[in-house]
């Protein structure tokens, strides 16, 4: 009787999947050293390219991975029919960056989990971690086989700029965390299609779009086409995605990395588009669409992936520690205190410590002390995890690098009786104030108007640390006397009275808060909308998010003389015409 030839021993260069013929002929189980990835979390496994045993090759890791779904980009590798551009399973801290040889536009997903280190740790079965992409948590960013396009120093510093067209944005009504990965991809592609139909001259406008499915119609809201079709300069860095008009240098949007929750390329008919979901005070949660020149969209996606990988690695090198009441506010960048909002129950905060819930207790403010909370200090990516953090208020063209040593040691302010800072509920940093009160002894009755905000969206990772009741330090008499000599200082003035004095864009004035003695507010008109910015932080320092000033007069003259806008929470305020007080 003829015997079947023995089944060859498992070769790691072969596809792990056995054909039905081999299974029937074998009758034996694979060797014990064969990895057994979860069938529910692994898609078709691609063999590594022959001769390419670099540890950064994405495919070489797949036999060791679980909880990872692979799907090919549109028109991807033959023999598989995966979702276009998908490189990671939902809920895992993985970013799929651009792969030059795998189709037009791979995806980036769950990027805020990289920026914050949130989400479940990727499970690795068999073998040890290897390669630069691998972190101690088993997460990685699959860089292109040719490597990243730009030097790390450039991405961590001033950023990489691309000339693209901004096509507008579409409101996203649900948190991306509540959606599965397929739906997230459909949301971004549907948003691209909606914008292509609405904007004349869009590359994808000629194709026939299928009607929006019912689930997507409940997720996508109104479109904002205010700047649609405008050529812009997109600057990608570990700090943010900055969108600036190419002609007038107006900043259209500045989305901090921790506010970006999902990014994707278009389908084969809209391959030159990049879309990402982010939150900002103007559009709330929205999907922003960019039209790239031919062949550039993949480079944009790859650069965004590089920025998130660097940001995540810096986070892992300097993870936040369990802070104590004395250093809990170290690294505070002022993004919560410097702007007034009209509706206090719906404040949105940017958290510079992604993935970390605000600790309770403690009223001593040590945020600017050198050496305090070294684990909570920013690693190296500007704005969220970098020692060179300068916030979002950098002038156009100014490098974002810096040295944390420039932060001077500031002692905590001495206790001061009387009114406490931020009693006015119109200030942006009063959210969670009652939680802090209860944690330190229940000082004051709870205020439902302040503490009744909607549940936070953990996926967007923007809950700011609970505000502290820090009494303001005594203001020097010289500052008050100096302001009285300034023509744009109007003394104590309410918000409504101040807004009534503004007529043209660029008009501004400075007023003293009617509720908090010693606090000064800059009121200006930008794009027809009044803005109110606090000028004195809880420690009594006159500052914006990137500079500290000797006085309010110094701050005003600095921005007026240099024609620099003050940027706060993604919007800017230009100081052009001072509104002089009437004698």
Curated annotation (Swiss-Prot):
Keyword presence, Acetylation: yes
Annotated segments matching region CH1: 340-487
Localization annotation: Cytoplasm; Cell junction, Focal adhesion
Modified residues annotated as N6-acetyllysine in this record: 154
Modification after translation: Phosphorylated by activated epidermal growth factor receptor. Phosphorylated in response to FLT4 and KIT signaling. Isoform p46Shc and isoform p52Shc are phosphorylated on tyrosine residues of the Pro-rich domain. Isoform p66Shc is phosphorylated on Ser-36 by PRKCB upon treatment with insulin, hydrogen peroxide or irradiation with ultraviolet light. Tyrosine phosphorylated in response to FLT3 signaling. Tyrosine phosphorylated by activated PTK2B/PYK2. Tyrosine phosphorylated by ligand-activated ALK. Tyrosine phosphorylated by ligand-activated PDGFRB. Tyrosine phosphorylated by TEK/TIE2.
Pfam families the UniProt entry points to: PID, SH2
Description of its domains: In response to a variety of growth factors, isoform p46Shc and isoform p52Shc bind to phosphorylated Trk receptors through their phosphotyrosine binding (PID) and/or SH2 domains. The PID and SH2 domains bind to specific phosphorylated tyrosine residues in the Asn-Pro-Xaa-Tyr(P) motif of the Trk receptors. Isoform p46Shc and isoform p52Shc are in turn phosphorylated on three tyrosine residues within the extended proline-rich domain. These phosphotyrosines act as docking site for GRB2 and thereby are involved in Ras activation.
Name this protein carries in UniProt: SHC-transforming protein 1
């Amino acid at each position: 009787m003829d015997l079947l030839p023995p089944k060859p021993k498992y070769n790691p260069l072969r596809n792990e999947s056995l054909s039905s013929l081999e299974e029937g002929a074998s009758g034996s189980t694979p060797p014990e050293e064969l990895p057994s990835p979860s069938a529910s979390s692994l898609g078709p496994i691609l063999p590594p390219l022959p001769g390419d045993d670099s540890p950064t090759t994405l495919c070489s890791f797949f036999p060791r991975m679980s909880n990872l779904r692979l799907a090919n980009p549109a028109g991807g590798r033959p023999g598989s029919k995966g979702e276009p551009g998908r490189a990671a399973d939902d809920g895992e801290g993985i970013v799929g960056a651009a792969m030059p040889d795998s189709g037009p536009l791979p995806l980036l997903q769950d990027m805020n989990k990289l920026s914050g280190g949130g989400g479940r740790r990727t499970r690795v079965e068999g073998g040890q971690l290897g390669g630069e992409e691998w972190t101690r948590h088993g997460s990685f960013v699959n860089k292109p086989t040719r490597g990243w396009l730009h030097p790390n120093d450039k991405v961590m510093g001033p950023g990489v700029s691309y000339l693209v067209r901004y096509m507008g944005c579409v409101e996203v009504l649900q948190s991306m965390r509540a959606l599965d990965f397929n739906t997230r991809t459909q949301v971004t592609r549907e948003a691209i299609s909606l914008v292509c139909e609405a904007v004349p001259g869009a590359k994808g406008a000629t194709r026939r779009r299928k009607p929006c499915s019912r689930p997507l119609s409940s997720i996508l809201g109104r479109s904002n086409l205010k700047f649609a079709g405008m050529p812009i300069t997109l600057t990608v860095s570990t700090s943010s995605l900055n969108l600036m008009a190419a002609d007038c240098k107006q900043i259209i949007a500045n989305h901090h990395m921790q506010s970006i929750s999902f990014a994707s390329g278009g389908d084969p008919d809209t391959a030159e588009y990049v879309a990402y979901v982010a939150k900002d005070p103007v559009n709330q949660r929205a999907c922003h669409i960019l039209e790239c020149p031919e062949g550039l969209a993949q480079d944009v996606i790859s650069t965004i992936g590089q920025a998130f990988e660097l940001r995540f690695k810096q986070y892992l090198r300097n993870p936040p520690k369990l802070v104590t009441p004395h250093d809990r506010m170290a690294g505070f960048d002022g993004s919560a205190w410097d702007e007034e909002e009209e509706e206090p129950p719906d404040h949105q905060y940017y958290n510079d410590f992604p993935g970390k819930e605000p600790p309770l207790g403690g009223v001593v403010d040590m945020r600017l002390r050198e050496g305090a909370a070294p684990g909570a200090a920013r690693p190296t990516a500007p704005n969220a995890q970098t020692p060179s953090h300068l916030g979002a208020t950098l002038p156009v063209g100014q490098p974002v690098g810096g040295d944390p040593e420039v932060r001077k040691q500031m002692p905590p302010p001495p206790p001061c009786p009387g009114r406490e800072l931020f009693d006015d509920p119109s200030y942006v940093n009063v959210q969670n104030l009652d939680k802090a009160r209860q944690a330190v002894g229940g000082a004051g009755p709870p205020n439902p108007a302040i503490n009744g905000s909607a549940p936070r969206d953990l996926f967007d990772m923007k809950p700011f640390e609970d505000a502290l009741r820090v009494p303001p330090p005594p203001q020097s008499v010289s500052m008050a006397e100096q302001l009285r000599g300034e023509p744009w200082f109007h003394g104590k003035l309410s918000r409504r009275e101040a807004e009534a004095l503004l007529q043209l864009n660029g008009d501004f004035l400075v007023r003293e808060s009617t509720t908090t003695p010693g606090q000064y507010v800059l009121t200006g008109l930008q794009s027809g909308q009044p803005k109110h910015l606090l000028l004195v932080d809880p420690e009594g320092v006159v500052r914006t998010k990137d500079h500290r000033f000797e006085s309010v007069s110094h701050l005003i003259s600095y921005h007026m003389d240099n024609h620099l806008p003050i940027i706060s929470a993604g919007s800017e305020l230009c100081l052009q015409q001072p509104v002089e007080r009437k004698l």
